[in-house]
Amino acid sequence: MIKSTTNPQEQRLPRPEDQSPAPPPPPPSSATTSTAAPATPTHQVATVIANMDTLKTAFLPNLSMDPNVHVSPHYCPMCHQQFERPQHVADHMQLCHGITLNAQGAIATLDGGHPQAQQHPKLSHPCFNCDEKFGNAVDLDEHHRLAHQTPAFLSRCLMCSIYGIHSATQQPNEYKCTQCGSICTTAMLAAGQQGFMEQQEAAVTPDDQLPAMAPRDMRLTPEEQHHQQQLQAEHHHQQQHQQQQQQQQQQQELLEQQQREMQEQAQQQQVHHHQQDQDLAGDQVALKVPPLTVKLNKNANGGAIVSHPQVIIKEEPLSLSDSGDVVNSVPVYAIQANPGVPAPASSGVLVGTQTVPADLAHKIRHKCPDCPKTFKTPGTLAMHRKIHTGEADATPKERPYTCSYCGKSFTQSNTLKQHTRIHTGEKPFRCGYCGRAFTVKDYLNKHLTTHTGEKPFHCGYCEKSFSVKDYLTKHIRTHTGEKPYTCPYCDKRFTQRSALTVHTTKLHPL
């Protein structure tokens, strides 16, 4: 039964007229509580409050303990919290401590003299950081401040669930990558975090995202922020490793594809040459020697003299082509009768030790060693080679393709296309080993031999080998003494065109 009247057992709150505005009395010490009567619920609450104040002093050393600051005449006897009005004290004690005050401002007691406390208050304020629940916001705030706002060395990492003491033992300015073992500085942490956040915004799958941030993440301590940056930077670094591995795999596949294409091209050329040799061997016919005419001349005595025409055999370097493709030059022997006896229109020619049918004679071409052009007669080839040696310039008819950037003319449209890439900067042929790009595919094939080490072109005079056929051609000239490039001013000859250019620039400037 609750007693509402004042009696000696009632514990009254101090009033303004009964006390001076001195600071509230401190809670009873441990020595006092040890010698006092059996602890009542009020004394137990006071003991808990005393321990809480000890925690405050330990974890918040900068908290002002001056009792003269913000002293109010109305305070809670349980926790010494100050209020402006007595009604606020009553509401506070009922909500926070479960103690009810009567109309006279005294603590309502039971028959046994113990203060009345609310049994089983409604726990409507859960903690977001643990499973605890509280009956009011004040207790929840006190719990959060003491239990979850402890120093950093006791806090729990929100990212990896490891207590923060592990971050204090590590180097604050560096972290080690688990993929490559490299150590990054704090300057790289900021860059890693920025790149990680950009990837998080562009990510479309939840697997690539970090765990969702809890409400308390907005109030991270500096140690927690530093540790979070480390994890984010490490995650970004691992993604960079994956991208690099994918790029290396793509480059390796590109290299393998280029090597397969080169091997297939070489095999096709070998098959083509072998098939051509078989066709020539299978279609050979007997050599048709021009018919010899016998002319009877009478001498002075009236006798007859038989006159035989003289057959002349001369050797010329020619090249054969069955389908318009130029092949390597082979020795071709052209049989020509004496000019006194005209040869028939259809005649055979001897190729090495074989004969070539007459219907293939018109396909015999003379290939220029400096460019892909071919000619029907050696004389036409000789006139054409003067263009390369500088003895004569090509006529406008021979250079119908003009560059729109510089006005330079070319004999072939493909050559103009390659030249135009010099002005546009286009290099569509890229090396898969080093990334170097070229304007012409032949240049790329020559460059690839520097990586593979392949030297398929061997010199017949010495043991040297070359990766490019042009290099072999220039080298052979050192053995044969051939100098196809002649200076148009002093008739001096050179083995290479570059040497002629240097000579003309220095000794014969325009």
Curated annotation (Swiss-Prot):
Residues 30-40, 240-257 have a biased composition (Low complexity). Pfam families: zf-C2H2. Residues 1-40, 222-279 are annotated as: Disordered. It is found in: Nucleus. InterPro entries: C2H2-ZF_Transcription_Reg (IPR050717), Znf_C2H2_sf (IPR036236), Znf_C2H2_type (IPR013087). Keywords: DNA-binding, Metal-binding, Nucleus, Repeat, Transcription, Transcription regulation, Zinc, Zinc-finger. The keyword Membrane does not apply. A zinc finger (C2H2-type) spans 74-97, 125-148, 366-388, 401-423, 429-451, 457-479, 485-508. Transmembrane segments: none annotated. SMART domains: ZnF_C2H2 (SM00355). The keyword Ribonucleoprotein does not apply. Residues 222-237 have a biased composition (Basic and acidic residues). Transcriptional regulator; binds to the promoter region of Cp15. Also binds to its own promoter, thus having a probable autoregulatory role. This is Chorion transcription factor Cf2.
